[in-house]
Amino acid sequence: MKFSENWLRNHVPIQANRDVLVATLTAIGLEVENVAVLGEALDLIVVARIVNVVPHPESDRLQICQVDAAQDTLLQIVCGASNVRPGLVVPLALLGAKIGALTIKSTTLRGVESNGMLCSAKELGLDTEASGLMELPDDAPIGTPLADYLALPDASIEIKLTPNRADCFSVRGIAFDVAAACASEVTPLHIDEIPAVSARTLPVELHAGANAPRYCGCVIEGIDPAAPTPVWMAERLRRSGIRPVSLLVDITQYVMLELGQPMHAFDVDTLRGPIGVRLSRNDEALKLLDGRTVVLDNDFLVVTDADQPIALAGLIGGWETRITDTTVNVFLEAAHFAPVAIMGRGRKLGLHTDASHRFERGVDPALPPQAIAFATRLILELAGGKPGSLIRVELPEYLPAPASILLRRTRIARLLGIVIDDVEVERILHALGMQVTTQAEGWRVVAPSRRFDIAIEEDLIEELVRIRGYEHLPTALPIGASHIAMPSETRLDMTSVRRQLIARELQETINYAFIDAELLRRWQLNTGQVMLMNPLSAELAVIRPRLLPGLVAALGRNIARQLERVRLFELGNVFTASDEAGAAPLETQHVAAAVCGDAFALQWGEQARKVDFYDLKGDLESLAAASGAVLTFHSSAQPWGHPGRSADVWCDDTCIGWIGQLHPALTQTLEINVDVIAFELALEPLVRGALPRAHALSRFPFVRRDLACVVPEHVTWSELAITVRDVIGSLLRDVKLFDRYVGKGIEPGFKSLAIGLILQDDTRTLIDRDVDDIMAKVVMAIQQRHDVRIRS
């Protein structure tokens, strides 16, 4: 099914952009196979009229045209199209317009100046199979931008439908699903019956029982056979994969695409009556619209005139009663044919039509009278005429009845494993066009007549989860043989985490998950402990709430064995007591590291220095960068941390851990006589990241500005950096702290920070005035938020 995006949006008002719409369609089961964007680059292309055409003196194929584009003078354009002629209204690309990679310029062709280009639909990307100039209606307003005239830009969206979703072979059918998924509502379609003006009618007889239980029609006299298809209708058809033919045929196709009801139009002057629907007889012959004559068996459903076949019902019309260029009186047909009566018949004859594709899967039995009224109104508006009364013949006992289903709350919860709010259930069902009545145990739901796929309670539950999204269902690990899967590109596995830390010269340790309660008391972690009922020993009586106590104890044992430079890490689970009485402990996975000694191994090319906070912070940021996680650091008040040399680590507005130097009082009680730098974080936020995206390098130069400021001691560099990023936004490529000074010239309680800012725009070169304005805003923001003073 192919349709116009703008056409769909006319039926369901949604704010979602095209990408979101396409993703939504696929998510709710209407798989998008292709999206062809139309008319996104039609600047300087206008509607124009060819006033005069003369042959080119130096070429047999070229013509010299004088073209009216609503400018002061006519434009001279050389054109080689076969259908160029005076009076023709066509798209004109003015000088400076771009057609693909071609920029239209004034040029000379065989000695004759040409100041523009007359365009075909193919050149404009509107029709890949078109040839010759695109011919516009004579009444198209000259000088109007073509994009405005053709309601562009637009997109032709093609979706792949499963056999059970025949209701989505129409724009309105798709609109109901989109409305439900996007929390919108389908625009009501008011189709009033057209009052009869003509008394002409045709008798109809149904002799096929359940195969054809409803047949509707209408005779319209005195239409204008020369009336053209309006451009808005032709474009909607073209963008839906149907080439416009003639007004009457186009109207039947348009109604089919909008409502989902296949129709056929007969030249009423070729009919004698009565019209009938019956099964074919062996060896009956019929000449089809495609010019072939076929011989039928007794298994085809046929429309007859005076008991003679004139059409294959639900497949294709006949040659003798076809609409021609001279047809002025027409009989419109819209009927309900059962899928079993149409299925497989086309294959017998090598036929596959839009009508058969729909009837084989099921068409809404309530549509025929609406389709007749809609098509009649369009014909009267576009071609005039006098309509007769609606012809409506039915066999009520054979018409399919909509399913009435009890939907229970308990059944929803049992099948899905979740509870869906009553308001949400009713919203989804109403948006899908269902009648919903509240009952004590749930709802009584009547499915719309177009939804043949809804028959039982489970079908309704499927609709709820399909629209809400399967991602909201709880998941469980499958039971059975495991299979090797491709690693996720947006998530680090444990092996990658280990490799990343090992690459930073850290060594993995594995410690007991049980720990001494006395050790936790020294760390002031003796609240919320999970005690073992049957511990192995008194020293292993508590399940560890954090990794650091055991990891630092291991570091202390290494120091006691005369190792001066120790760098350890651990991955493992930690346990905390649940707030709910009797509930199992909460188990989460953490990563921790502890280092001491020299920053680098002893060597002649590097001056020896002790490891510090910033060294381990770099190791942590390297791990975060591997997954794309963004970390920020804020002042910490953890009792085991050194005041002023530790920080809480945040990710996505959540505190996930701690980093810093251990408090000297703690290391003293642990009998560790060196400074220990450590971190511990919840692992999940670190390993969950976004898929990296490549961005083109800007071809414009960057600008660096440095800022020296005096900052209160309690204000952290992280807080300043956040403020700078908030103020500058996307123009800020990087911000670095390259100097920190405390001492002479700086009053107590303050520090001097030197900040480097890199600014760059992807679309233009930043000038001094731009940069000065940005820097002024930065200075004002940090002064107001952080009581900063700028150093001169």
From Swiss-Prot:
GO biological process, one term: phenylalanyl-tRNA aminoacylation
UniProt subcellular location: Cytoplasm
GO CC terms, sorted: phenylalanine-tRNA ligase complex
UniProt superkingdom: Bacteria
Keyword Metal-binding: yes
Catalytically driven reaction(s): tRNA(Phe) + L-phenylalanine + ATP = L-phenylalanyl-tRNA(Phe) + AMP + diphosphate + H(+)
Record carries keyword tRNA-binding: yes
Molecular function terms from GO: ATP binding; magnesium ion binding; phenylalanine-tRNA ligase activity; tRNA binding
SUPFAM superfamilies linked to this entry: Anticodon-binding domain of PheRS, Class II aaRS and biotin synthetases, Nucleic acid-binding proteins, PheT/TilS domain, Putative DNA-binding domain
Occurrences of domain tRNA-binding (ranges): 39-147
Domain B5: 400-475
Record domain FDX-ACB: where: 698-791
Cofactor(s) required for function per UniProt: Mg(2+)
Family listed: Belongs to the phenylalanyl-tRNA synthetase beta subunit family. Type 1 subfamily.
Name of the protein described by the UniProt record: Phenylalanine--tRNA ligase beta subunit
Lineage of origin: Bacteria, Pseudomonadati, Pseudomonadota, Gammaproteobacteria, Lysobacterales
Gene: pheT
